[in-house]
Each structure stands twice: as structure tokens, then as C-alpha cells.
Amino acid sequence: MGNIKGIGRIYQQTFVDTYSRVAMVKLYTDRTAITAADLLNDRVIPFFDEQKIPLLRILTDRGTEYCGKPENHAYQLYLGIENIDHSRTKANSPQTNGICERFHRTMQDECYNIIFRKKIYSSLEDLQIDVDHWLRSYNETRPHSGKYCYGKTPMQTFLDSKYIAFQKNISSITQEPDISFDYLNSSVS
């Protein structure tokens, strides 16, 4: 994010649901695998758990805070514990993560450009409070023109999609499975 007088260097971790555009942001004074995992642990996973929807896959850039050897990289370990598949953007191709990049531009225009003109921040916590206030508005009151939003808020889109996903899941569960079990060989085919 940049250097803020009185606070120092600030880094932003961002999560954007690519279907609904629901976004979550947390600010940090460093950029590490631990802080990347903290956003998921503190905000993202609890949100999805509350909605009773599993987070199956995540797309990140190729930054060192997200990528490393799975057996000793904090972010990779966290994804493994949570059973989340990890996809990475193409190298030197920010457009691969265009939804997140577009969100950053919106946040810069609608949040940071305004709040930094109104107030001088002396702590990361104060800044996070104002960022969270803007995020609530973005997610819950600001209509979005995204592919699946059709002028609804990201949260309305998420809740609508939750119902659709539930219906699809029910139909796949109620179909007769095509499984035969051979007791002699103990194999599933």
C-alpha cells in the first residue's frame, strides 16, 4: 500500500470472492506468509464457515508470501490444513487476477483517496476501522455491476448464489451413485 506518516510502511492483504465480489481487507506492517494466512484465518474462513460454504480454491499472485515449499511455508501449510486448493496467477500477468486488481483500483478511488484527505492517522488500528467501515458499505449497500451482480450488492449476490449452490449440491446428492463394490477384491469401481 505504501508509507503512511506516523504509522510507517503498510501492506494490504485482500480477498475478493470472484463470483459475488464480496471483499475482505486487512492491513499489516509487514508482508509475510503469516500475515497472508492471518487474513484467511481472521476474516475469510470464519465468514465462509458462518455461511456454511466451504472455501475450495484460492487464486493468488506469485509473491513470496503466498508461494513456497508446501512442507515449510506458513501460507501453504495453512491452505493444506484448511483443505484449500491453491492456484497461482501466470507470471508477470496481473490481468490473470483482474477482479482483485479492479477492486484495488475501486478501493483507492472510493476509500483511500477520500479518507486520507479527511484525517491524519496515527495508528494502523484507526486506519483499519475506517477501511472496515468502507468495506461494509462496499459489500452491503453499494450496487455492483459485476458479471453476476446485475446491480445487486456483493453480499446480496453472495447470498443468492448460496441458495443456487445449495440447490445444485442437493441435486447431485440425490442422484443415484454409480458405484459397485466387489467384496472379493475389495475395490471400488
Model-inferred region functions:
Residues 1-12, 18-132, 136:
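RNase H-like DDE/DDD metal-dependent nuclease/strand-transfer catalytic core used by mobile genetic elements
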Residues 82-84, 106-189:
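C-terminal domain-tail junction helix/linker
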